[in-house]
Amino acid sequence: MFLKNFFSLILLLTHFASIAQRDTIAVNTDWQFVVDKKVIGNTEKWFENILSNTKTVNLPHTWNIEEENQNHYGWGWYQKKITIPANWKNKSVVLEFGAINHSSFIYANGKKVAENIGDGFNKFFVNLNGKLDYGKENVITVACNNDYGKNKVPFGNSFDWPNDGGIIRKAQLIVSDKPTANYIHVTPNLNLAANEGKINIKLGLDEVKNIQLSIVITEENQPTKNIVLSKSVTPVWQNGEAVIGFTLSNIHPWHFDFPNLYRIDVTVMKGNKAVDKISTNFGFRELKFVNGHTFLNGERIKLMGVEWTAGSNPNYGFAETDSVIVAMGKLMKDVNCIFSRVHFQQDDLFYDFCDRNGILIQEEIPLWGYDTPPGNDTVEAIAMKQLHNMVKNHYNHPSIMTWGVGNELRGRDEKMKAMIKRLIEKAKELDPSRFASYVSNSLNDSYYNNPKFVKDAASLGDYIMMNEYGGSWWDIPTGKIHQYIDSVHLSYPDKPFFISEFGLCEPNFRGGDERRLEDLIYHMAIYESKPYVEGAIYFDLTDYRTHYPGTSEKNKYRRRIHGVYDMYGKPKPSMKILRELSSPVEVQGLRNWGKGKLNVLLFGSLGLPQHICKGYKLYISDKENNFLQTKAYELPDIKPGQKTEFNVDDLYNGKGIITIVKPNGYVATQKSFYWSEKDQ
């Protein structure tokens, strides 16, 4: 018995010796912080000393929501003491920052180890190898600046969101043996006919070595958690990357109603020793355009959604916690969002939410606004760097369908168009598997039938993205919106056509939520009457904070009243209207149908969005919030435009509230069939 236990212990120790030695250690607590309103920190070399007059803060953090610092746009200093074990000397030690807005200098024990200039929203990494005192306490100092400078993107004050400075996202240390895997890129290719998927895996390592890779691929975010592949392979080295490929059978594709994911764990083996381990999620989907029409996994679809502007809650600003990010994602899904865009790069958690909950995203670099100068080499260089890092950081997210290179720039200026063209080409070079696009507000400046017609920069992308504000920012009769949209389509007939923004901005255009309702309804009616409109994005999910003047609020409360929720996530009446207009299924009637039965009349949406409703459930209840306590009726598949009649039990004397729920648990539509007898 002793020998049996002894050999079992030896096997266990051998097993643990082979487990990959990667630790991720959060470093978000007990940072010392001080603002530098006198701009003396650099000249007095604060980075060489322990900061004085500080307060303790936790990450993520921004000073612009603090009462005394709301209007400070300049330098802020952070410092943290970290004890580094002596046995880390031969390991790889990397400090990861989720984002620091907008420029930062990183010091270890008084010496500069990194800088990140003009890029306030991308995740970045600081290699600390050989720059630490091992077995001792080390001091990490971060000096960051959020002034309205010109050595950044967005340029100067050319942006419409808050200017919150600080270490606005979380930070962590990544510790592993060597060689170290710096990144993993998984490119899936779905073969619908064969129900199989090929994956190409590229691993970026800090050095080329004779290594083996142990691969495990598991179902993720699916009803089952099967291991679909477990294999050890020797990679091929191409351009400094370790490359491997596999073919998987019986694939469950990613779809916004069925966001099936796969998890890949790659262990780097050096001989018999596991030196590092890197993991990511990915998904198989085929998204393509055919003759201007959109297809997802072979299904003809149209898209509808809403955009959320991060930093909108004045209690958090850009320093949003995980719970706030997830809560905002849920609000998006509560209005049937399956399609969105972001004006600037978001926290990894946001894209993970979109992966798991089914939202297709256009992620953009924050190259924004008319004041961005054409032909500016500095701006273009920073934009290119941001684009590179954005693609590298978020390559594996199946929710990301497009890389966006700018919004509302001078879309007819030849120098600006040339820069946009180069950015789109770079996006396609970095990631040939996705679309690239530019969002325009100048498509209506002139059309194909104008003798002096010059194509807009939006034509350079894979599809047209048009910001449309007829009846508000556009000083035209609402009836003329039809003509404007038709003219744009006729000017670029070979391009799929999407509405990238529409909505009502207060206080510029007053009228409250009642006017917002009217604006939403008539714009949706216009888009849904156009067979060539492939999708639309409502702007915005919430009222959002901005540095722009023009509102009665001041400091951190300055805002655009633009949302179907307020800044804190409280719904307005327009929220339910957006949800109903964005539903893929319509409930049109509840009729008596024999003794004890009611008949529900349903149609698949022929507007926005359009897709097959598969796996949806129907409930009838007497209140809006208690439907899950009632019987669930499994609905048949409903195609766009298809009429479906469905019988349910009559529990409330011919009345009731019909709720239809998507496979992932979100309400698609909810309609009351209660009425007052005096109204009959």
Where are these regions (language model features)?
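Short, aromatic- and glycine-rich surface loops/edge beta-strands on solvent-exposed regions
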Residues: 139-142, 258-270, 653-666
